[in-house]
Amino acid sequence: MPDSRAAPQESLLDASLGTTQENVGTSSLTDGQTLSKEPLSHALKLSTPEKVKDAQLNPPEEALWTTRADGRVRLRIDPICSQTPRTVHQMFSTTLDKYGDLSAMGFKRQGTWEHISYTQYYLLARKAAKGFLKLGLERAHSVAILAFNSPEWFFSAVGAVFGGGIITGIYTTSSPEACQYIAYDCRANIIVVDTQKQLEKILKIWKHLPHLKAVVIYREAPPMRMPSVYTMEELMELGNEVPEEALDVIINAQKPNQCCALVYTSGTTGNPKGVMLSQDNITWTARYGSQAGDIQPAEIQQEVVVSYLPLSHIAAQIYDLWTGIQWGAQVCFAEPDALKGSLVNTLREVEPTSHMGVPRVWEKIMEQIQEVAAQSGFIWRKMLLWAMSVTLEQNLTCPSSDLKPFTTRLADYLVLAKVRQALGFAKCQKNFYGAAPMTAETQHFFLGLNIRLYAGYGLSETSGPHFMSSPYNYRLYSSGKVVPGCQVKLVNEDAEGIGEICLWGRTIFMGYLNMEDKTCEAIDAEGWLHTGDTGRLDADGFLYITGRLKELIITAGGENVPPVPIEEAVKTELPIIRNAMLIGDQRKFLSMLLTLKCTLDPDTFEPTDNLTEQAVEFCQRVGSKATTVSEVVGKKDEAVYQAIEEGIQRVNMNAAARPYHIQKWAILEKDFSISGGELGPTMKLKRLAVLEKYKDVIDSFYQEQKSKQGSSLPGFSLRWQTGASS
């Protein structure tokens, strides 16, 4: 190792550790493919029944929550959820026994797909764990990962847990300041990065991170030799210096009710909160939450999954990483530019059996299909519209019927099967979405392609899914049924049966790291998690989300107005609208901010000025020649504004009462985005940020207008221009 580096610190290891020699390749992944199986047979001793019994619950006096990284909690074992708790290592050991020779991960190297088996995956995780220990990983401290999805992300995460640490993901889009907050809060001993860009962020803030001992970089080489900065290959070499027995001692001491993962919320209302997840949270949810979604074990059918959503978010982490281990799935990694356009190429090559996307991803796929259709020949376009029309009608009228009419089967054979194949969904049996609401328009579009989108509902605080839809539990617009073994209750229900959703079960998190007040707000005295979301349950137990308590608008007149149903109604009525945000808290009436559907820059994923094909078609239907946002907004296109006003009036006509009417609105010059601050990492609307950013526009809605002069479009009551009431 370079002499300029500080010597790695040892913490959980005895200072007199010996060394063992193993085969060392030229890269961390090649290394995993050539490792001897001798350490594996040694490690498997830990998965015997005697070791499983060792992982027992702690005494019953332990509380249901803690805010300490080294704390333990009482597991929520009861008659309906009595499964034996397991650690992550025990889960992986069972997988090795069943699926050791199966492909665990697929990744592209120089244009060619390569694979890592579960045996190789396990050995890589052990070597990473020993490397982390050699670098000074302390118990209940973190290994933070600031990188795009990759095999290194996976075996570093598992290795961190094996080594007694806590895995903490950081969004790759995070600023240095955001990285500093998380790395400091989680007491990161080691940070793993994939590029020089991410390394530079850490170098800027290192002096503010007293617990940080080393950085590991793997996709790109560091620009120069630097103290305490290692490549992944060097980390693995350091792991050779730690005996297998030393790692076994650490693994064997782990308990299911200890923290092994931290998931940081997006911080829409302040600093991000570190959601502490126990080993039992992870292993129970990976098994039973995925079963509720009909994920299959590899002995029945090996699931194939494309990993591309941020692993720092609980949805991707539980679905890609932990569920993959539980059932022996093959996880194939997309390119880092997946969300900039390459995802479909990966889907075509991999042909996944199940797939998950946030609503914006599904919307982007929908827009791409619409653009291709608009540029296709007349006959093909008409055939596609016919096929989607008859298929949508069938799926809406007989959603559970396996007996399809001849016309529906013909439409699928002639048209829709080809579309699904072009998307990479020829073999995909389960398509999931979560993390944000999905419009009825998007759901109908994919039903027209004979693609059901199965919703799940959960939070970081529920380790991911607490409700799941599946081919056997599906109802349009619902979030599915509660995962067997979990519980739900609605509190403070109104006359329509809508109340706050409260949850209980093995999915419920340990607590917020270092935030006792926030933890007590979330978990009541009886141990129920108060989600802050509102919803209703139908007679069959399907959950329908109606909004959030914190988002509930209380007008100056005392009317309680949930914004989401009104926003969704506007987007359904006006297909040119991408984002709609209702305003009116403590105001005399409701108003709304709108953005138009525009294309995204393929390199930056930023909104452009160009309208999508669907938006252009809308303009043409209403008599406008506009093709850009600036033509509509900058020139106040009369035809488009009139059409939007009429659409909003139609929404108002269907409102329950006049206080629910949208009285004023404005179209913003640019669509919402992550970089603009209006959207979170999963494209969820950050309402407080929008209120602050567009404060002047909003205030203009409620200023008393002294004169109506200056209106270029009489008859609009200046609703959309200056905020004057009609």
From Swiss-Prot:
It is found in: Cytoplasm; Cytoplasmic vesicle; Microsome; Endoplasmic reticulum. It comes from Bos taurus. The keyword Acetylation does not apply. Its main location: cytoplasm. The keyword Lipid metabolism applies. This is Long-chain-fatty-acid--CoA ligase ACSBG1. It is an enzyme of class 6 (ligase). The modification Phosphotyrosine is found at Y641. Belongs to the ATP-dependent AMP-binding enzyme family. Bubblegum subfamily. It comes from the Eukaryota. One of its GO terms (cellular component) is plasma membrane. The lineage of its organism: Eukaryota, Metazoa, Chordata, Craniata, Vertebrata.
